[in-house]
């Protein structure tokens, strides 16, 4: 979900259409480069088609157009149009092979809190199921975490988090939302980076583990460590890179042995 730290106000958007290469759910571009919403949308549809070739994407297309209109003139700290964020949330959900209602909810997860669009309008356009998902994500985003008591209250907060979501898909959308926010933390202040990282370590990563979503859990852990204890993280990266040739040689030896049989 977005807060004051995620928005950079309004300004005219300069369209910088550039080729976007996407590898394992990440955009391979320099941080200062813009990502074109249309290219990201096509990447989303390609992902959906991969696990559901006959999927009816009409609802997803409609959600994208409505979300883009609702978030127009809104920008993230990075300077990107705000629609980039819900698009990435939807892409993460597609990587998890979620149904179209969940992907649509991911695309619209911020509209009730951050725009003039209402739940009744979402229900009228997309049905009650999607509206309930968006409502659930909005309510989870309103949970207050006490920085001073977060560690002591972590288990109770996790239980509250799980209890508030009547549909497990609400939590999955929220995890996807947090994951993309963590991926773009370089645009936040150091204090906010540490605060969000601690929340993620204590609340979000353990919930992802409980749900068996190891892919998200692992990345949340990595990103949290990167911003909460950057010295430790950088040392780990250095050690892993130093051992990379050794690991690659070992893998090649194993492959060679297997090939003999």
Task: Pin down the residues of each PLM region.
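Active-site helical microenvironments for divalent-metal-assisted chemistry
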Residues: 2-261
């Amino acid at each position: 979900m977005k807060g004051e730290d995620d928005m950079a106000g309004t300004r005219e958007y300069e369209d910088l259409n550039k080729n976007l290469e996407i590898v394992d759910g990440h955009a391979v571009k320099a941080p200062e480069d813009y990502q074109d919403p249309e290219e990201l949308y096509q990447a989303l549809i390609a992902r959906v088609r991969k696990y559901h070739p006959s999927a009816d994407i009409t609802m997803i297309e409609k959600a994208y157009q409505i979300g883009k209109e609702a978030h127009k003139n809104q920008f993230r700290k990075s300077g990107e149009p705000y629609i980039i964020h819900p698009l990435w949330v939807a892409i993460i959900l597609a990587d998890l092979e979620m149904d179209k209602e969940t992907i649509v909810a991911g695309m619209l997860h911020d509209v009730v809190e951050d725009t003039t669009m209402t739940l009744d309008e979402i229900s009228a356009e997309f049905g009650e199921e999607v509206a309930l998902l968006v409502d659930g994500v909005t309510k989870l985003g309103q949970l207050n975490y006490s920085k001073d008591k977060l560690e002591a209250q972590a288990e109770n907060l996790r239980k509250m988090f799980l209890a508030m979501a009547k549909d497990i898909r609400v939590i999955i959308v929220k995890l996807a939302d947090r994951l993309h926010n963590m991926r773009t933390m370089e645009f936040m202040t150091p204090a906010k980076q540490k605060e969000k990282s601690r929340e993620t370590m204590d609340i979000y990563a353990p919930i992802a583990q409980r749900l068996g979503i190891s892919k998200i859990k692992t990345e949340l852990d990595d990103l949290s460590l990167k911003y909460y204890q950057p010295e430790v993280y950088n040392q780990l990266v250095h050690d892993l890179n130093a051992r990379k040739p050794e690991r690659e040689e070992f893998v090649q030896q194993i492959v060679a042995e297997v090939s003999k049989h």
